[in-house]
C-alpha cells in the first residue's frame, strides 16, 4: 500500500489516515479542511492501491456500522449487482468492495480504533473530540 504524507503538522491534533479517491470532490474538501486546521494526516488512494478484504474488514469494524453502509449506491455496478434489491451481509459486502473499488464510499477517516465516513466532511470532527 502506498501512503502519501500530507505535509501539514503545525498544530497536529491527531494522527489520521484518510482513505480516498484523489479526484473525488468531497475527498479534496476534506483534505482542505484538515490542512486549514493544521491537522496531520496520511492518505491512501484506494482506487490506485486497492484494499484487500482484510483491510476493508478492519475499516468496517472501526466504523461500528454494517459494511453495506459503505456502498456507493450511485455506482452503476451497484445496480448491475442488484445490491439495492436484497440484503447483503458483511462478508459479501466486503468481498464486493474489494473486487469493485468503486463500490466503497469515500472518504473514510481512521484515528486509532475508530473510523467515520466523512460525508459531510465535518463528520471528521467525531474523531477529533
Predicted regions and their residues:
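General helical structural elements
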Residues: 6, 25-26, 32, 110, ...
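Low-complexity, intrinsically disordered/propeptide-like segments
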Residues: 4-6, 33-36, 86, 106
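Local sequence-structure signature of Cys/Sec-based thiol-disulfide redox active-site neighborhoods
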Residues: 12-37, 41-46
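Thiol/selenol-based redox catalytic cores and closely related redox-interacting motifs
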Residues: 48-129
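N-terminal amphipathic/basic-hydrophobic helices that include classical n-h-c signal peptides
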Residues: 1-12
Amino acid at each position: 500500500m502506498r501512503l502519501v504524507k500530507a505535509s501539514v503538522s503545525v498544530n497536529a491534533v491527531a494522527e489520521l489516515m484518510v482513505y480516498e479517491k484523489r479526484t473525488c470532490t468531497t475527498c479534496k474538501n476534506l483534505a482542505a479542511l484538515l490542512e486549514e486546521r493544521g491537522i496531520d494526516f496520511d492518505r491512501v488512494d484506494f482506487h490506485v492501491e486497492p484494499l484487500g478484504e482484510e483491510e476493508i474488514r478492519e475499516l468496517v469494524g472501526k466504523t461500528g456500522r454494517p459494511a453495506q453502509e459503505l456502498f456507493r449506491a450511485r455506482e452503476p455496478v451497484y445496480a448491475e449487482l442488484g445490491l439495492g434489491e436484497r440484503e447483503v451481509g458483511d462478508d459479501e459486502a466486503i468481498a464486493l468492495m474489494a473486487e469493485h473499488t468503486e463500490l466503497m464510499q469515500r472518504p473514510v477517516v481512521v484515528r486509532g480504533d475508530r473510523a467515520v465516513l466523512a460525508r459531510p466532511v465535518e463528520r471528521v470532527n467525531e474523531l477529533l473530540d
